[in-house]
Every structure is written in structure tokens, then in C-alpha cells.
A protein has these predicted regions:
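Glycine-rich phosphate/diphosphate-binding loop of Rossmann-like nucleotide-binding domains
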Residues: 15-16, 28, 32-34, 39-40, ...
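Short beta-strand segments
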Residues: 6, 35-36, 59, 100-102, ...
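Glycine-rich phosphate/nucleotide-binding loop
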Residues: 112-125, 131-139, 219-223, 227-338
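N-terminal phosphate-binding or glycine-rich loops at protein starts, especially the Walker A/P-loop
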Residues: 1-43
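Short glycine/serine/threonine-rich phosphate/pyrophosphate-binding segments
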Residues: 13-17, 80-93, 97-111, 118, ...
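Phosphate/nucleotide-donor binding subsite
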Residues: 51-95
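Solvent-exposed alpha-helices and their adjacent loops that cap or buttress functional pockets
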Residues: 6, 26-27, 50-51, 75, ...
Length: 338
């Protein structure tokens, strides 16, 4: 396996990207890395580490796409950027998966324009895996498509099921649809029609509507929604977790008794923090693209980068792209036909 890594993507690049990549190489020896970015800067950082040089290549990319750039224009104009160069490696079959903590818009636009969608896939979807009370859950879509049709949501269900089955080994992943009630007739025009499609779909274990308060229950393995709703849900969860942690720290410091109690519960708090830490999950796969794409969090540190590479490895070993392709062509096209 070969991974094309945008060395200059993210708030902590390139240092965190290089360090996290070296750490990932020490964990598994079945992949190699192609860094894209300023060649001299990358080699200067690599010189600080001991690593198997036969597993690392560098492709010079002097330009950077920033979050201030208009994504589609930047992808078309900045052909020497680290994102564009890395995506071409995947498109040309020289790398199996692309990993970046850079501009989300540029990754989405570049993946679609350069690597292209899997035949039959109408829209790719950003699909982070999140912790719940009972295990991991995929939320799809989380921002790639603000406006969706019912057919898009049906395809998201197929793509999410393929990932959770291939990567996490979940047999017949339970699929839920975010809605404002659990009853079949609930929702707007989009969710009502999507419900009908999901209920009738072959190869999907659809278990019904999911209210927002049940997202973290662990009763669903894949939760489907349009990108506008998914992005709002994801950011609400991130903000809620951060606020709860802040309130908890404030209460702990409010009295000696609370501080002593916190010390006695230190291991439990540490375990909870680990479960809720995005660095443990690495990044969100962009599903529906004809090659592996992992979008890491913009503020990724070396731990998050290392986890993202581990996620890329599982994505490729799980044969997710081919599974999605087979599902879309075999299960959906004959019945949707749109």
C-alpha cells in the first residue's frame, strides 16, 4: 500500500504531519508514504527521525491551497499545490489513499475533479466515525452536500454500510435516518421519500428514523442525513463535549471535596476523554470517490495524523471502494434508475 500525504495541510503542518507519519510507520510495516509539499522543508524535518528510507518518497509541491482560497478555482489554478499533486498520485494509480488535514473544500473539489467518483455514485459524502455508548457509529453526510435528493441519501446508506462492514467488521450494519420523530410519516419531503427508498432497498439493514437525542445511543451503526444537517450535528456534538468538559473542570475546582473525588476518579475521566477524543479516530473518509480519501481534522496533531494513516490502512485493507462500487451497480441502479 502507498499513501499520498499532504505534508502542508492543517494548522500544525508540516511538523505534526511528518511526526505522525513516522509514528504510523513504526506501528505497521505494510505501507509506504509519498509526501507532497516543499521538498527541502520535508527532508529537513525527516532528518530529525530514524526511519526506513525505502518506505518514504517526496514529491515537490511548492504551492499551498489555504482555507481562504476558493476551493474549485484553487484546485484548477494551483496545480503545483500539495493537495493537487497528492490527488494526482491517487488518480494515476501511484498511491492507494490520499490523506490531508488541509482545506476541506479543496479536498472535496479536488477528489471529485481529479480522482473522480465511483461509476454510478451521484455524490461523494464526508463520513466521520464517532463514539457512542455502545461502539463506533458513522454519520454520513457531514458537509459535502448541503442539498440532497432522496436518492443521494440512499446511496449514503450503501456507502456507510460498506465502510462499517469492511473496516469495522460489523455484519449487517444498522442504518438510521435522522428525523424529527421515529414514526414512518415524520419529517419533511426529503426524509419521507428517503424513508420509503431505504425501507424498500435491497442490501441495507434499515431500522427506521433516528431522533437527534438517540444519535449517541449506540443503537445505530450508520446514520444518514444531508450534509447541512450532518455538519450542524457534528459541530453541535463537538461544542457540547467541549462545554461539558469545561463545566466539569469548573465544578471540580469549586471545592476540596470535589477535587478529591476527581482524583479518585482520575482513571475514569481519562478513559472518557480518550473515548471522546477525535485524535483517536483520525479523520473522516470521503466515500464515493474512486480511490481512498481521508480528510483529517484541520487542527490535527501528530496523534491524529497517525490515527488517520491507520484509518487509511483499514480503508484499503477493507476493500471499501470496490465494495461500494459493487453495491451501487448491483443493488441501487436497477431500482432507482435516476
Amino acid at each position: 500500500m502507498k499513501f499520498a500525504i499532504d505534508a502542508f495541510g492543517g494548522d500544525n503542518a508540516p511538523e505534526a504531519v511528518i511526526r505522525g507519519s513516522i509514528d504510523a510507520m513504526q506501528l505497521n510495516d505494510d505501507f509506504s508514504i509519498i509526501f507532497t509539499g516543499d521538498e527541502s522543508a520535508i527532508y529537513a524535518l525527516l532528518n530529525d527521525y530514524e526511519y526506513d528510507k525505502s518506505r518514504v518518497e517526496v514529491v515537490h509541491a511548492p504551492d499551498i491551497i489555504t482555507c481562504e482560497d476558493q476551493p474549485t478555482l484553487a484546485v484548477r489554478r494551483k496545480k503545483e499545490s500539495s493537495i493537487v499533486k497528492a490527488l494526482h498520485l491517487v488518480a494515476d494509480g501511484k498511491a492507494d489513499c490520499f490523506i490531508s488535514a488541509g482545506s476541506t473544500g479543496a479536498v472535496l473539489a479536488g477528489a471529485t475533479l481529479i480522482v473522480h467518483r465511483i461509476p454510478g455514485v451521484k455524490r461523494p459524502a464526508l463520513a466521520p466515525v464517532l463514539p457512542t455508548l455502545k461502539g463506533p457509529m458513522m454519520l454520513i453526510d457531514c458537509g459535502a452536500n448541503a442539498d440532497c435528493t432522496p436518492e443521494y441519501l440512499l446511496q449514503f446508506a450503501y456507502m456507510g454500510s460498506a465502510y462499517m462492514s469492511g473496516v469495522l467488521g460489523i455484519e449487517r450494519p444498522r442504518v438510521g435516518l435522522i428525523n424529527n420523530g421515529t414514526e414512518e410519516g415524520k419529517g419533511n419531503a426529503l426524509t419521507k421519500e428517503a424513508y420509503s427508498l431505504l425501507k424498500a432497498a435491497r442490501g441495507i439493514n434499515f431500522v427506521g428514523n433516528c431522533e437527534a437525542r438517540e444519535l449517541m445511543s449506540g443503537d445505530y451503526d450508520v446514520i444518514v442525513c444531508d450534509g447541512f444537517v450532518g455538519n450542524a450535528v457534528l459541530k453541535t456534538l463537538e461544542g457540547a463535549v467541549a462545554s461539558i468538559m469545561t463545566m466539569l473542570k469548573t465544578e471540580i475546582k469549586s471545592s476540596k471535596r470535589a477535587s478529591v473525588g476527581a482524583m479518585l476518579s482520575k482513571n475514569a475521566f481519562k478513559a472518557l476523554k480518550t473515548r471522546m477524543d477525535y485524535t483517536e479516530y483520525g479523520g473522516a473518509p470521503l466515500l464515493g470517490i474512486n480511490g481512498g480519501i481521508i480528510k483529517a481534522h484541520g487542527s490535527s496533531d501528530e496523534r491524529a495524523v497517525c490515527s488517520a494513516i491507520g484509518q487509511a490502512r483499514k480503508l484499503i485493507l477493507g476493500n471499501v471502494t470496490n465494495t461500494i462500487s459493487g453495491l451501487i451497480s448491483r443493488e441501487m441502479e436497477p431500482q432507482a434508475g435516476k
